[in-house]
Amino acid sequence: MGKTPGKWIKTLLLGKKSPKSNSDNRSQKLKSAKKEELVESVTEDLSNLTVDPPVVSSQPVPASTAQNVVSPINGDESKDNLESRNDLGEVELEQAAIKVQATFRAHQARRAFRTLKGIIRLQAVIRGHLVRRQAIATYSCIWGIVKFQALVRGQKARSSDIAIQFQKKHMEASDSEVLQSSTCSWMDNPTKFVFVDKLLASSPTALPLKIQYGPEEPNSAKVWLERWTQLQVWSSGSRVPRIEIPKSQSKKRNYQAVVEAEKKRPKRSIKKPSGTTSGTGPSRFTAERNKPKRNVRKASTLSKDPLRNESDKANHNSRKSRSGSKEGSPLEIKDEKPSPSLKRSSLSNGSKKATLRSAEKKKKDIPDSSVQIQPEGKVSENVLEGGDNIEFAEKEKDTTDSVQIESEGKVSGNVLEGGEGENIVFTEKEKDTADPVQIEPERKVLEEGDNIESSGKEKDTGDSVQIESEGKVLEGGDNIEFGEKEKDKADAVPIEFDIVKDEKSPVLDRTEEDELKTAETSDKAEALKCADVKVSSENGNVGSDNTKQSEKRALLPANIDKQDDGLTLSGRKIPSYMAPTASAKARVKGEASPRFAQAKTEINGALRRHSLPSPANGKLSTTTMSPRAQKLLLASAKGSMNGDKSFTSSKDITHKSTRTDWKR
């Protein structure tokens, strides 16, 4: 029929062309004809017009012209009437087409409905037949299975001894007749089997399994069917619900039993000590005795830190060694295990040189000895017969590009044989390295009884300059020796000084030390012209009158000179308002270092090294000098060097390679 049924109907009734298209063509023709007629009428009117002037006698002429003019108006009205008639015809045609289309569509719908109805009936017939055949087949199969089961079970029941005894004693003929009559009572109503008979009769091909029994047999087909229908196995309510214990319940029971057992175990463990020792004194003792065991286990896990272990051992062993030295019991000292390297180093009991040399050898043989040093600071202790020897080393590196700080605290308590006091070695190394700058101060303190040796090294290398300052303090009683050396050299020439040699020990015998101390202190006192300081060759006591003045003079220049050029002890710059004035520097330097004032007039610009006159052995060992005198000497030396720095930096600017610039 197509998408537009109206066109189909029009083509069916009027032919190939639709009436709508014909009416359109007609209307277009009418319009074109009207236009042509109007044009013709206008041209005729124009041709009829006269050029001559009007005459009086010819009065009816205008009327004729008026009639000719009005005539086209009447023609237009007639044309409008024709168009309206044509429009009415088109509307009637459209209405007729709509009616025809509606009737045709209703006819098609009714026909489709009939076909669908017939298809549904046909499907019901076919499906019903298939369902019936399937139902018969299933019924026959189930019937045969149930009959076979009934035969087997009946045979087993009859063959059993219990059934035979029951039949002999309790079963009688009357009872069997009553039972048979009750079971076969449904045979009177044949209507119960009508549906089954019809179902079986409709399909002769699907025959069930037939096992012939007599009517009196309880396992015959009819009797079995009666019993089966009475039980109503197919209904859901007739089924007996099975009461089974699932495995989950057993698991839950087992889990509960395990949980109860676990709950009982800690209760038993808690009840045992309380039950055995109920409220008595020993019970409390045992309860308290059990508590530390748990704490000991925790402490054992926490005591794996090597720092704590070794520090505790060091403190414990040092206490034992001190108590042994005071009480004089050699048994406690023998219990400690000395290292083999320290045994080799302890040569004699009485000589002090041997003790000091053994201490120095111990420094060198640290990697070979049992004293193991690790960079995070580990404490190891080695004890021999005698006093204590403690070495503490700390290294600190500060780099501007990559700051690396390594602190090493090393304490090794070594009790040497024949030592009267405590030998303490304190070494501190601090390295502050910028890109080309390296500063390494070192101090070493050796105390023999009350003797202390302190040495500090500072290395400041600029582009090609290296400065090393060394100080030695040897204190005998109250006597302190302190020396400082500074050396500068340009054009990348490194200078190094060994403060303490292996074989040349700064501590001599008592007799030799006394002679050297007396000789050197007298020379130094005369050279420095320290009238207010009185040096004693034996005890090194200072006069009480000039003590405060010498302390002020010794400390003030050191503090001012170390702050020279805006630098503090740590090398950091201080603000300008905290820096000392030029007048104070000049006054202090003039009082403290008069003999080095002439060094400022040098022309070459290079820094000059000022050092004290060395003795015959090449070492500065003014051990008999008092600490105040040594501070004054240090202040004078530093003041002169700072003056030289300021002079050379202001004198020659071009000698950049030879100047010492403190850099961060």
UniProtKB/Swiss-Prot annotation:
The biased composition feature labelled Polar residues covers 536-547
Q: Name one Pfam family in it.
A: IQ
What is the protein name stated in its UniProt record?
Protein IQ-DOMAIN 28
Broad class of the protein's primary localization: nucleus
> According to the UniProt entry, which residue ranges have a biased composition of type Low complexity?
51-64, 339-353
Q: What keyword terms does UniProt attach to this protein?
A: Calmodulin-binding, Cytoplasm, Cytoskeleton, Nucleus, Repeat
Which parts of this chain are annotated as the region Disordered?
1-85, 244-488, 502-573, 637-664
Offer a single GO CC term for the protein: extracellular region
Oligomeric and partner information: Binds to multiple calmodulin (CaM) in the presence of Ca(2+) and CaM-like proteins.
Q: Which part of the chain is the IQ domain?
A: 93-121, 122-140, 144-170
Any GO MF annotation of the entry: calmodulin binding
Motif (Nuclear localization signal 1) positions are 251-258
Enumerate composition-biased segments (Basic and acidic residues). Answer: 76-85, 305-315, 358-367, 427-447, 502-532, 652-664
